[in-house]
Structures are given as structure tokens and as C-alpha cells.
């Protein structure tokens, strides 16, 4: 279980939320006023961290949502082949392979240190733009 809980009213732009078991960064959040037939609602628009897809959900403001625990680490690039990068974690020395966008392959060279994020059993290299 690599997530915690938070109420919708506690969320802010730039924080993270789990939508359909996918970690997403909140890009817009709007709260409606309570109406005649119900409590206030929060509309959340978020972009997936790993899939870059736009997700949108509506919840009551008192509803508890899952917030992913994102671990930010560094790794050394060991090799690059077929749009995949083999990395070695700088702390645990664990080696693993991460698929990379072809546009980002030009920025990655063997031997360099790259930051990566890990959440919900997935990993992604987070290069500076």
C-alpha cells in the first residue's frame, strides 16, 4: 500500500492524487457551493504522471481520496537499447530497465546520473526540461 488518504477540500494544484489507480498531478481544482439538494462538490482535473493522460473526476468535498506516496531517487545509466534504459539505483545498487520516450533518449548518456520517480509499482525517469 503506497498511498495515503486526504479529503478533497485539502487538495491543491500541484499535489498528487490516485485516479483509476494511476498517480496524477492536479492541474485544476474547483469547488462548488453547497446546493439545495446536496453538499459542495470538488471537480479535479489531473495529468497522469506515467501516462501523461488527462483525467477528470468530481467528488463531494468531504470524500476521502487516495494520495500516492511518490519516492524520488537517483540512478546511474548503465546502458541504452531499443528505447529502454538500464539503470542502477544509487542507494540500493538495484538494476532495472525503464522504457523511455524516444525524444528523451538524446538527453541520456551512459554513465550519467538521472532522477527517477517510483509510485504504485511504476518507475519513470524525470529529466529537467
Curated annotation (Swiss-Prot):
Spell out the molecular function terms from Gene Ontology. Answer: ribosome binding; RNA binding; translation elongation factor activity; translation initiation factor activity
Localization, per the record, is:
Cytoplasm
Database matches in Gene3D superfamilies: 2.30.30.30, Nucleic acid-binding proteins
GO BP, one annotated term: positive regulation of translational elongation
Please provide the record's keywords in A-Z order.
Answer: Cytoplasm, Hypusine, Initiation factor, Protein biosynthesis
Q: Which cysteines are joined by disulfide bonds?
A: none
Instruction: Indicate the principal place this protein occupies in or around the cell.
Output: cytoplasm
Q: Which GO terms describe its cellular component?
A: cytoplasm
**Superkingdom assignment:** Archaea
Pfam families referenced in this protein's UniProt entry, alphabetically: IF5A-like_N
List the PROSITE patterns hit by this protein, alphabetically.
IF5A_HYPUSINE
Q: Which residues carry this modification: Hypusine?
A: 36
Q: Which family does it belong to?
A: Belongs to the eIF-5A family.
Q: Which PANTHER family match?
A: TRANSLATION INITIATION FACTOR 5A FAMILY MEMBER
Q: What does this protein do?
A: Functions by promoting the formation of the first peptide bond.
Q: What is this protein called?
A: Translation initiation factor 5A
Amino acid at each position: 500500500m503506497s498511498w495515503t488518504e486526504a479529503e478533497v477540500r485539502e487538495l491543491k494544484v500541484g499535489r498528487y492524487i490516485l485516479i483509476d489507480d494511476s498517480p496524477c498531478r492536479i492541474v485544476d481544482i474547483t469547488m462548488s457551493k453547497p446546493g439545495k439538494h446536496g453538499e459542495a462538490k470538488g471537480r479535479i482535473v489531473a495529468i497522469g504522471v506515467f501516462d501523461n493522460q488527462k483525467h477528470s473526476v468530481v467528488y463531494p468535498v468531504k470524500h476521502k481520496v487516495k494520495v500516492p506516496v511518490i519516492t524520488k531517487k537517483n540512478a546511474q545509466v548503465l546502458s541504452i537499447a531499443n528505447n529502454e534504459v538500464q539503470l542502477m539505483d544509487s542507494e540500493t545498487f538495484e538494476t532495472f530497465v525503464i522504457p523511455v520516450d524516444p525524444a528523451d533518449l538524446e538527453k541520456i548518456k551512459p554513465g550519467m546520473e538521472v532522477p527517477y520517480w517510483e509510485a504504485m509499482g511504476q518507475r519513470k525517469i524525470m529529466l529537467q526540461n
